[in-house]
Amino acid sequence: MQKRYPSDNIKIILGGGPKKTEGWLNLDILPIPEVDIVCDLNQGIPLPDNSVVAISARHLLEHLDDTVKIMEEIWRVAKPEAVVSIKVPYYASMGAYQDPTHRRFFTEKTFQYFLPHKEHRTVPDYHFRAEFEIVSIGYIWSARWVRYLPFKSFFRRHFLNIAKTMIVELRAIKN
């Protein structure tokens, strides 16, 4: 049985597992006490359209079957201007490939697919209807000393294991 949470400011964590955050609903496939709504996110997000003001997906997208489908679901449940925070293994990190349950790999270009301005795309438009704005892209570096490297952008693009995680903040665009 799923709990009901009446609120105008619903915030959700997708795939939060045992990590409970005060004030946020935790949606996960695991039926454990910290999970508020047990669901398979491959099948969608069991919340109404335009009902969520903030969405967090930490190390989840790489495990799901269809990135486009989950992004459409995130957009569907997001209110206009909702903030979406995504944390994924960076494609050039060993951790991205080490885990055999990872189905997808992510770069900065991955999230350009979801921009409203289609000229940023280098791949065909498959009639994706959800639109996001990229607010910021950041990284968690593989070692402390990397913070002090000059030209981090160059090293990140041309060498393995400089950045281990990419953090992307998006904003849902709805008319």
Which residue stretches match the model-derived regions?
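Conserved alpha-helix/loop element of class I SAM-dependent methyltransferases that forms part
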Residues: 1-9
